[in-house]
Amino acid sequence: MTEQTDVAMPISFTDAAAAKVKALLDEEQNDALKLRVYVTGGGCSGFQYGFTFDEKVNDGDFTVEKQGVQLVVDPMSLQYLMGGEVDYTSGLEGSRFFVKNPNATTTCGCGASFSV
């Protein structure tokens, strides 16, 4: 496991994302859960983002902590997410986590898939 707490992090998450994760963890009453962000093949642009809660941190996973919650990324996904930021939005179009990814050359209209 690689844990970063300094300023130069390969991926970060916003206060809004951390606050939402914390609220969801409080609902679940399971402090062992972490937000896992991953990239899989698919979507209309070639790759898509995935978000899930996970209790495990595997060997090689990258973790970053904010507001007492952890974000976890596997090494393969981290290659596509370098320099990115996980955020959370809630509005008329619904609520969702999303990734601001500087590596994405194209994204789909909903922002859930991308290409590099």
Curated annotation (Swiss-Prot):
Keywords: Iron, Iron-sulfur, Metal-binding. GO terms for molecular function: 2 iron, 2 sulfur cluster binding; 4 iron, 4 sulfur cluster binding; iron ion binding. Coiled coil: none annotated. The keyword Iron-sulfur applies. InterPro entries: FeS_biogenesis, FeS_cluster_insertion, FeS_cluster_insertion_CS, FeS_cluster_insertion_RrpA, HesB-like_dom_sf. Gene3D superfamilies: HesB-like domain (2.60.300.12). Iron-sulfur cluster binds at C44, C108, C110. It comes from the Bacteria. Binds 1 iron-sulfur cluster per subunit. The keyword Zinc-finger does not apply. Signal peptide: none annotated. SUPFAM superfamilies: HesB-like domain (SSF89360). Belongs to the HesB/IscA family. HAMAP family: Fe_S_insert_ErpA. NCBIfam families: iron-sulfur cluster assembly accessory protein, PRK13623.1. PANTHER family: IRON-SULFUR CLUSTER ASSEMBLY 2 HOMOLOG, MITOCHONDRIAL. This is Iron-sulfur cluster insertion protein ErpA. The lineage of its organism: Bacteria, Pseudomonadati, Pseudomonadota, Gammaproteobacteria, Alteromonadales.
